[in-house]
């Protein structure tokens, strides 16, 4: 019985917290979709396609391949050179 009451209170608290912390809960999706459609028409407008800075070969990248210009990372950025 106590566990059920605790679970109900937790669900109500998390639901209220979601609504309180939302930026604009009424019109959030209305403004979101036109931006996505605009980015689909112009892929260069997407922020995901822009790389501000990337690491050259031999630079330490840890386990994050997105940091390397070549997209290959095994602790250090790696580039593969074609010989032919």
UniProtKB/Swiss-Prot annotation:
GO cellular component: extracellular region; host cell presynaptic membrane
Propeptide: 23-51
Subcellular localization(s) per the UniProt record: Secreted
InterPro entries per record: Conotoxin, Conotoxin_d-typ_CS, Conotoxin_omega-typ_CS
Keywords of the record: Amidation, Disulfide bond, Hydroxylation, Ion channel impairing toxin, Knottin, Neurotoxin, Presynaptic neurotoxin, Secreted, Signal, Toxin, Voltage-gated sodium channel impairing toxin
Described function: Delta-conotoxins bind to site 6 of voltage-gated sodium channels (Nav) and inhibit the inactivation process.
PROSITE patterns xrefs: DELTA_CONOTOXIN
Modified residues (4-hydroxyproline): 65
Pfam families, sorted: Conotoxin
UniProt-recorded name of the protein: Delta-conotoxin-like MVIB
The family this protein is said to belong to: Belongs to the conotoxin O1 superfamily.
GO molecular function, one term: toxin activity
Superkingdom of the organism of origin: Eukaryota
Domain notes: The presence of a 'disulfide through disulfide knot' structurally defines this protein as a knottin. The cysteine framework is VI/VII (C-C-CC-C-C).
Annotated source species: Conus magus
Disulphide linkage map: 54-69, 61-73, 68-77
Tissue specificity comment: Expressed by the venom duct.
């Amino acid at each position: 019985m106590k566990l059920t009451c605790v679970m109900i209170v937790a669900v109500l608290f998390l639901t209220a917290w979601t609504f309180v912390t939302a930026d604009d809960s009424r019109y959030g999706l209305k403004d979101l979709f036109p931006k996505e459609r605009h980015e689909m028409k112009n892929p260069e407008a997407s922020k995901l396609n822009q790389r501000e800075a990337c690491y050259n070969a031999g630079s330490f990248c840890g386990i994050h391949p997105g940091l390397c210009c070549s997209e290959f990372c095994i602790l250090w950025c790696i580039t593969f050179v074609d010989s032919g």
